[in-house]
UniProtKB/Swiss-Prot annotation:
CDD domains in alphabetical order: PPAT
Pfam families with a match to the protein in the record: CTP_transf_like (PF01467)
Positions of ATP binding: 9-10, 17, 88-90, 98, 123-129
Annotated GO MF terms: ATP binding; pantetheine-phosphate adenylyltransferase activity
Pathway annotation from the record: Cofactor biosynthesis; coenzyme A biosynthesis; CoA from (R)-pantothenate: step 4/5
Subcellular location: Cytoplasm
Protein's UniProt name: Phosphopantetheine adenylyltransferase
Reactions this protein catalyses: (R)-4'-phosphopantetheine + ATP + H(+) = 3'-dephospho-CoA + diphosphate
Domain of life of the organism encoding this protein: Bacteria
Gene name tied to this protein: coaD
Amino acid sequence: MRIAIYPGTFDPVTNGHLDILKRATEFFDEVIVAVAVDSNKTTLFSLEERIQLLETAAEELSQVKIRGFEGLTVEFARQCGANAIIRGLRAMQDFEYEFQLALMNKKLAADIETIFLMTQSEFSFISSSSIKWAASLKGNISEFVPPHVERAIYRKYHPEIDD
């Protein structure tokens, strides 16, 4: 069985993330979305909320599982029996960072490959940070995230607004 993990903070999950996830399922029997706990980042959503948002977003993808993790990505991959780490690339600046990360992961776990998937052009500018920024200013983010994620973001930033 070919198993991969797709790690990230997913704060929040975007249509770009979902595009990478759907395409990864074409290559692997099982893809585990590894929702990271990162003590260096302050997240808008708790780990449990991020997992729930992802579960709803990926409910039609039968070979996808969502799990939280803390620590080294390659160690989590080993625990899951995965032999690949999926990473999405939007632009050249993503590649430089991801390349360094892939080299470090290869040193830590030579048996685990990093697979890069390019985002579709319509998602190349989307980031969780820019979506949160726009939402905080009451901008329209409906084309960047699934509807349930949009509602959750607006509830965080603008609790006075009704669904």
